[in-house]
């Protein structure tokens, strides 16, 4: 559902931010 999709997108963004921070 939308919640699952939103969670996936947020997860990807979080990973991108974490990688960028490193």
UniProtKB/Swiss-Prot annotation:
Protein purpose: Antimicrobial peptide.
Leucine amide found at: 22
Tissues/organs with expression: Expressed by the skin glands.
Keywords in alphabetical order: Amidation, Amphibian defense peptide, Antimicrobial, Secreted
Protein family (similarity comment): Belongs to the gastrin/cholecystokinin family. Magainin subfamily.
Keyword Hydrolase among UniProt keywords: no
Cell location: Secreted
Name by which UniProt lists this protein: Peptide PGLa-BM3
Record-level GO cellular component terms: extracellular region
Coiled coil ranges: none
Protein's organism: Xenopus boumbaensis (Mawa clawed frog)
GO biological process terms held by the UniProt record: defense response
Nucleus in keyword set: no
Domain of life of the source: Eukaryota
């Amino acid at each position: 559902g939308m919640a699952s999709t939103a969670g996936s997108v947020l997860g990807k963004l979080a990973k991108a931010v974490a990688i960028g921070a490193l």
